[in-house]
């Protein structure tokens, strides 16, 4: 597993790089984990419906090829893109989603933030509020896209959408529980727990 820390990047640029990586990899290519933040952007998943974008203001909307509905990415949110040959690892996509949820819960529990999952609504929650989203794409047995964990960000753009297609879905973030939390520290813990699941 190769880990890349990419800093803050434009969504469309990284999306194109993910597609190119996935299209050109072969059975000997190492899996990769890309860690980054994005400049403010709304992304629509393949199941996304226009009516879930309520008031985008000046924030760009990108129609993506990942699974799921609309979400928001912005600075202070840890994004981890999972470029993995799940066929080689004998993993089903649902199993991968469950493992990613477990990793996110482990990270949150490390900070003593009680997290849970909800049936029929992928992602991770603190109480009824969503703290992390998951959206993947599989092509030729290989995944791209990944997770987004709200660490210490401006949550107000989520008010301009129905996050993940759920009206009035409330969002939260780790800084509500730890005001001085640093994204770099959270990223390190995410990698640690990720590598315990995926060598």
From Swiss-Prot:
This is Octanoyltransferase. It catalyses: octanoyl-[ACP] + L-lysyl-[protein] = N(6)-octanoyl-L-lysyl-[protein] + holo-[ACP] + H(+). Keywords: Acyltransferase, Cytoplasm, Transferase. InterPro entries: aa-tRNA-synth_II/BPL/LPL, BPL_LPL_catalytic, Octanoyltransferase, Octanoyltransferase_CS. It comes from Legionella pneumophila (strain Paris). The record marks 130 as: Lowers pKa of active site Cys. Gene3D superfamilies: Bira Bifunctional Protein, Domain 2. Belongs to the LipB family. One of its GO terms (biological process) is protein modification process. In the reaction, the free carboxyl group of octanoic acid is attached via an amide linkage to the epsilon-amino group of a specific lysine residue of lipoyl domains of lipoate-dependent enzymes. Its EC number is 2.3.1.181. Pathway: Protein modification; protein lipoylation via endogenous pathway; protein N(6)-(lipoyl)lysine from octanoyl-[acyl-carrier-protein]: step 1/2. GO terms for molecular function: lipoyl(octanoyl) transferase activity. It is found in: Cytoplasm. It holds the Pfam family LplA-B_cat. The active site is at 164 (acyl-thioester intermediate). CDD domains: LipB. Residues 27-199 form the BPL/LPL catalytic domain.
């Amino acid at each position: 597993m190769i880990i890349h820390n990419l800093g803050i990047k434009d969504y469309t640029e990284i999306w194109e790089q993910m597609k190119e990586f996935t299209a050109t990899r072969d059975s000997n290519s190492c899996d990769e984990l890309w860690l980054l933040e994005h400049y403010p952007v709304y992304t629509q998943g393949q199941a996304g419906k226009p009516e879930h974008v309520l008031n985008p203001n000046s924030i760009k909307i990108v129609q993506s090829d990942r699974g799921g509905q609309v979400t928001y990415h912005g600075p202070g949110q840890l994004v981890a893109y999972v470029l993995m040959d799940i066929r080689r690892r004998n993993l089903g996509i649902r199993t991968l989603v469950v493992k990613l949820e477990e990793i996110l819960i482990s990270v949150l529990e490390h900070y003593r933030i009680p997290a849970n999952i909800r049936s029929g609504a992928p992602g991770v929650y603190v109480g009824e509020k969503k703290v992390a989203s998951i959206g993947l794409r599989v092509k030729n047995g290989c995944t791209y896209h990944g997770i987004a964990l709200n660490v210490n960000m401006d949550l107000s753009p989520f008010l301009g959408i129905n996050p993940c297609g759920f009206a009035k879905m409330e969002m939260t973030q780790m800084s509500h529980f730890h005001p001085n939390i640093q994204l770099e520290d959270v990223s390190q813990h995410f990698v640690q727990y990720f590598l315990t699941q995926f060598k």
